[in-house]
Amino acid sequence: TGDLGASPDNINWVLTSYIVAAAIMTPVTGWLADRFGRKELFLTAVVGFTVFSMLCGIAWSLETMVFFRLMQGVFGAAIVPLSQTFLLDINPRERHGQAMAIWGAGIMLGPILGPTLGGWLTENFNWRWVFFINLPVGIVAFLGMAAYLPAVARRVRGFDFFGFAMISLGVGALQLLLDRGGEVDWFSSVEIWIELGLSLTGFWVFIIHTMTAEHPFIDPKIFLDRNFVTGLAFIFVMGVLILASMSLLPPMLSTIFGYPTVTIGVVMGPRGVGTMISMLVVGRLMSKIDARILVVIGFLLTAQSLYTMSSFTPQMDNWLIISSGVIQGLGMGMVFVPLSTVAFATLDVRFRTDATALFSLVRNLGSSIGVSVVTVLMVRNTQINHTELSAFINPFNPNLWAVSPAAASGDPMALSQVDRIVNLQAMMISYVNDFKILMVMTLLAIPFVFLLRKPKQAPAGGAPAAHMD
């Protein structure tokens, strides 16, 4: 933050600007792809994302950094949904599982390995290299896509400005609320109430407009597909589980266990290995095993890992952290690949680009909401736990006399040391309770897996099936 002359509070806008811009632009991906060409939009998105990533690396002030990050979000919003759309389009239905395994590996490994790589670059070089490293990746991606991506016919359709404005208002205000809530003490701030009101208004008007408009921004027929709607609900849950649990571990390992950044990356990295192995295996198993069974097994593995995390103590060794992370990676990979395949298996191909954009948007919203909720619970519960534990620090407690006679007799230095221990214990209890909540959420999701319908066998030539069992 010193390079930009910004305080830690102000630097949060660097993240907020990207998230809000990407959230607003994601829903419009389908219309832009139809209007300007899917391949052309994809190439433009990669170029824009890479260029503004480089500009972030050379930003000379907070204002320029925030603007460059905002533009990076504008261009980056289309990359994930378009990549999924292309892989679904260029592969026959019977190979969708393997295609989604490859795609999912990139989607899942990014959030897992990104912080580790970013921390290493920052410690050994400079924070600017977090952005510079995107240049060679962007160049290779552009050249590969320009050479091999097929051109897709454009489709002319009107643009629903009012619908876009309303969903942008709803999504943008919600993301601002989630990103700013922790800084301004949530609903004790007028700002948060305003953002909540704007978000609810935007979503409500958008829903009414979508149901009544002649040519709405998003065709409501998309939501008639049972698999897709169920898939949206589950990808929201996955968004919560993936980033919520991952957002808890680094501060816990740093604050309570005293791990340096590099060590945190080392103990969390194997989670990505578990995810990669799971996705590659599941991609092949989908042609032999009902995708719903794979999703159930994945949720059970995820719940098992969260149960293990709920037993974490400050005295445990690294292997418990690593093993629980690997199991969670295996579980999430087993959920993500079948879910990303089955959700689109019965959907009309006309809606695929809009649908992948919605899929990406809902996953990101789930991630944002999950991180915000578990963070709030951790902070608030730490305060409550600290108050309850502090009640035992008094001269009438014989256990305190046995552990620290100086603290029991009122020595200020000894009491300060005891208070530090109490605070760490209060935080540990809060982290454990968060993991328990995520575990229960995972288990509650399992019965609803069977709302997904198994699609009929793809017809010859791999054309998408339009009917369900």
What is each of the regions a protein language model found here?
Residues T1-A147, V281-V282, M286-I289, Y307-S310:
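Transmembrane-helix bundle of Major Facilitator Superfamily
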